[in-house]
């Protein structure tokens, strides 16, 4: 009987902490913590309804701008120079640099979204969901076609690519059903100038999807961290912001996992 009371107690506590009186996606506990009105849906932390992570300080990724030496993106000559013991040349033969690898924590980016708000990317963590990071540019045609598909569901422009698989259609459904978190980070506009709020605002206007967070890599911090050699460059993170995949170009590994063609690595 005591066990039953304990179970009921924990259920009541859990329900108390998950109450969302105004239905804005933020629990009353979070709203009281951040100072928004738990009974007013229009008074919320993020206009875009992005998650809020009360425990984001526990994510120990590198702060931006990245400080050298030793951190990922810094120059190196041997593995021991790097905090992650991974000194590599880029696919273009540049470097070597301390290079990201699976298990590394994505850096602590705070950037402007399509609604003009600064979003802390660590707020996406600890939500029990996979986080998809698409890195690209506004001039990148495949990036445009992927965002068009995510907006409309039309895959016709993607079916001409050799890397496209019909199983990838499931990814859009997972995004729209809030099963995964999808982030598009743009580092350049159509004129190949540094991205800013106008860049991501225009992107969202062209390819609207309220479930896709679009961020501007205004100072190229993520560009220098990833050192991509092709676009889009898509990787996935676990809920602790650790890389599940890492590539400097392409999307196949990430999309194969997201569409259940491959299992999540142990």
Could you say what each language-model-derived stretch is?
Residues 2-10:
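Sec-dependent signal peptide recognition
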Residues 9-18:
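Hydrophobic h-region of N-terminal signal peptides that target proteins for export
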Residues 17-101:
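Extracellular calcium-associated, cysteine-rich motifs in secreted modular proteins
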Residues 23, 126-132, 176-183, 208-213, ...:
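Loop/turn elements at helix/coil->beta-strand transitions in domains of secreted/extracellular proteins
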Residues 135-167, 191-192:
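Conserved redox-active cysteine motifs that mediate thiol-disulfide chemistry
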Residues 229-266:
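Thiol-/selenol-based redox modules, centered on thioredoxin-like
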């Amino acid at each position: 009987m005591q066990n039953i009371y304990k179970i009921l107690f924990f259920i009541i506590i859990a329900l108390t902490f998950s109450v969302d009186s105004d239905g804005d996606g933020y629990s009353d506990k979070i709203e009281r913590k951040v100072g928004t009105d738990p009974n007013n849906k229009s008074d919320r932390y993020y206009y875009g309804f992005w998650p809020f992570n009360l425990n984001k300080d526990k994510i120990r990724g590198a702060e931006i701008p990245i400080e050298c030496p030793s951190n990922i993106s810094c120059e190196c000559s041997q593995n021991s120079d790097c905090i992650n013991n991974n000194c590599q040349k880029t696919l273009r033969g540049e470097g070597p640099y301390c290079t990201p690898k699976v298990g590394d924590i994505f850096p602590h980016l705070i950037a402007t979204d399509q609604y003009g708000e600064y979003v802390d990317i660590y707020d996406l963590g600890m939500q029990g969901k996979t986080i998809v990071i698409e890195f690209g540019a506004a001039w990148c045609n495949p990036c445009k076609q992927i965002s068009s598909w995510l907006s409309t569901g039309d895959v016709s422009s993607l079916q001409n690519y050799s890397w496209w698989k019909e199983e990838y259609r499931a990814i859009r459904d997972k995004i729209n059903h809030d099963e995964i978190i999808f982030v598009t980070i743009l580092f350049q506009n159509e004129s190949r100038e540094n991205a800013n709020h106008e860049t991501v605002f225009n992107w969202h206007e062209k390819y609207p999807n309220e479930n896709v967070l679009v961020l501007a890599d205004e100072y190229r911090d993520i560009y220098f961290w990833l050192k991509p050699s092709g676009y889009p460059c898509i990787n996935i993170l676990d809920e602790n912001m650790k890389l599940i995949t890492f590539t400097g170009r392409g999307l196949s590994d990430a999309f194969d996992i997201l569409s259940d063609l491959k299992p999540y690595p142990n």
